[in-house]
Amino acid sequence: MSKKDSLWFKSLRWIQKKLVHTIVVPHDPFDDLNLDPSKPLVYVMKTESVSDIAALSEMTGTLGLPSPYDDLEVNGVSAPRVVCLEGSKPLFGERESAEQYLHCFKRLLSVHKQNAELDIQLVPVSLYWGRTPGKEDDTMRAAVLERQNPTWLRKCLMILFLGRHNFVQFSNAVSLRYMADEHGTDKRIAQKLARVARVHFQRQRKVMTGPQLPKRQALFHALLKSDSITKAIKEEAASKKISETEARAKAMEYLDEVAADYSDSLVRIAERFLTWLWNKLYKGINIKGAEQIRQLHHDGHEIVYVPCHRSHMDYLLISYILYYQGMVPPHIAAGINLNFWPAGPMFRRGGAFFIRRSFRGNKLYTAVFREYLDQLFTKGYSVEYFTEGGRSRTGRLLAPKTGMIAMTLNSVLRGVERPVTLVPVYLGYDHVMEVATYHKELSGKKKKKESVWQVFGAIRKLGNFGQGYVNFGKPITLHNFLNDEVPNWREDIAQDPEQKPTWLTPAVNTLASQVMTNINDAAAVSSVTLTSLVLLASEQNALERSQLEKQLDLYLTLLKELPYTEYTSVPEGSGKDLVSQGLELKKVQIESDALGDIISIDDSIAITMTYYRNNIIHLLVVPSLIAACLLRKERCTRDDVVCVVNDFYPLLQAELFMGIEDPKVYADSILDIFVAQGLVIENGHFEVADDKVNQLLLLSGTIDETMQRYAILFNLLAVKPNMERSELERDSHRLAQRLGALHGITAPEFYDKKLYATLSVKLKELGHLTDSEGCSDIKRIKDRANLLLRSSVRQTIVDSVNAEQKD
């Protein structure tokens, strides 16, 4: 009878099933870790433990992996399925020798010497009973509740009290074939394997639990002794004519206002609540790119998460996802407006630290906040902040606020030893709870102050919100960024550490823009966003079902055959599947008659649906521009298309934070897909296929409102090339309001003053606002913009511009 069939092991498994709830990290080891099911596999664990192996056995059965109780049989040689680096620890006395497990490594390596085709995978497995990092200088508690090397008695207590928070983490497999071929098969290599594995387990534990937590008051007193805060206290006392004791008390108040008070116990309780909440709200949360972030943590990077900001749910979603992906929830910079009872204290114990909207004029607060942020980086706590500064009301990314990015970069310049890496995060939802409120605010209604009653009101309305999306974008390691942007930055800082470098502000602006671009590069396409994009481009926000499905299939083909970036995610399935999902979520409605089904967006939520369209509009705006060019320019050639894309892409890039490396190559690839899909026929020039005109018309509709804005700008500049930026912004906004009133344009971003400010800055950067030398370029771009408009819209713009200038 095998071990796993013995009465002892059956009894143990029965007890653990009652007491233990295990979470696997990553959730799909075969996909995330590239395990090869056709190759033999051996598990490597840090410490021999009957309960750990029993927990592992439950998970391997679920995942279809070999049981740890079944010995490995290869070439007539039998070896344990689990190799442990340390023996079990008795209640009294010394730990058992691990020498026998070193022999296992040697035996496995020697088998590879005999069989050149064999390749055994060594898979490190870490088990955690709870994830408490512990407190600094808390030696008594550590001795009582030691988790890394517990005796069997302590392990029983851990299972009893922490069994519902058991994590089994699989790591990337090590190929013994590679080790044998590259390094040999002797005892020295076996010892090296054991050393590397020990380091790996140590790092993995820190990724899972995080660094030890400081005692809050001890941290405050240490920070008050720092040079920067000491200096700020003296300056505060001198400027306000108060004593240094009073100034120091003020600094302590600021620290108490700012600092988090992280509690692992509260995080465990919150995990249960959030599991219930997500299961009630969403059918699932789609995650992409978590493994690369786990690896950065493992490699010792200081991680700063910089997500887009859609909803108050963002705070909860990221922390929850990271917790379940085997990483520590970050310390989150939250607006001081969220520090209301009872949410504020709970957020603080969940890792939130609070930040005022403005530091201007308050040097003491600035010094306190910067020193606290430096301390987080130095101690190794991951941090999260929203670079937009607030939630987007339109669904587009907002222009970044650079304050937190500047402070992060300053921390690097002051000598943070670990590599600091910004991780852009794209967050998407099939339903954003606040979206109706956003549009009320955009229409002029005063924003409500956050309170606990808003939270209760939102929870009361919980329903089927579809799915959530968390995509981790391309990381930006700040040392590498500085090396690329300012190769001599170390020398500049060394010469005068107190002097602000002249290159710092431009570098911060470049970095902030890159963060936003990387967020959009990781966009998640969904049934709601893509269906909104199609229907809002139609005349009455309605299409025949078959036509809608066909259009969605075209967009899916574009997004899959020409991926926007490797970080972008596109839904599986067909256009038919996406329509069904939209109907299920009640984002679209269906009407049936004798001729078939009509899918539409109800007029009452049409403006709301622009929010979801705007989440992904950047992914299809260039194909839309090309479609408009093919439809409205006679005998259009590839060169014509490329010229149009080159003229408008800089503005699209500034407005939508796009990161296409080579617009010409991208445009050519889109044209190739159009030809392959039969949308156009190429014979020296392009001819639109008669039966595909409607598909191109729908696609071109996506850029209509954007092109109308550009036409307003360039028609104004063509009439008055020497306009000041402020004048251009004012006049273009006024004309946009007139155009919207005459042609029924309701999209909130069409009237956004900040958007016209962004475009005017880009126009100045491109040289269109500097002098009269660019008049020929302005006229050319104006003519191209006008060509791409409907005649009625074009005439309204031309007439309005002429009337504006007469006034």
Curated annotation (Swiss-Prot):
UniProt superkingdom: Bacteria
InterPro entries linked to this entry: GPAT/DHAPAT (IPR022284), GPAT/DHAPAT_C (IPR045520), GPAT/DHAPAT_LPLAT (IPR041728), GPAT_PlsB (IPR028354), Plipid/glycerol_acylTrfase (IPR002123)
CDD domains, per database record: LPLAT_DHAPAT-like (cd07993)
Main location group: membrane
GO molecular function: glycerol-3-phosphate O-acyltransferase activity
One cellular-component annotation, GO: plasma membrane
Substrates-to-products reaction catalysed: sn-glycerol 3-phosphate + an acyl-CoA = a 1-acyl-sn-glycero-3-phosphate + CoA
Pathway of action: Phospholipid metabolism; CDP-diacylglycerol biosynthesis; CDP-diacylglycerol from sn-glycerol 3-phosphate: step 1/3
EC code(s) of this entry: 2.3.1.15
Subcellular location: Cell inner membrane
Residue ranges annotated as motif HXXXXD motif: 308-313
Enzyme's top EC category: transferase
Free-text note regarding domains: The HXXXXD motif is essential for acyltransferase activity and may constitute the binding site for the phosphate moiety of the glycerol-3-phosphate.
Recorded family membership: Belongs to the GPAT/DAPAT family.
HAMAP family in the cross-refs: Glyc3P_acyltrans
Protein name: Glycerol-3-phosphate acyltransferase
Species for this entry: Shewanella piezotolerans (strain WP3 / JCM 13877)
Gene that produces this protein: plsB
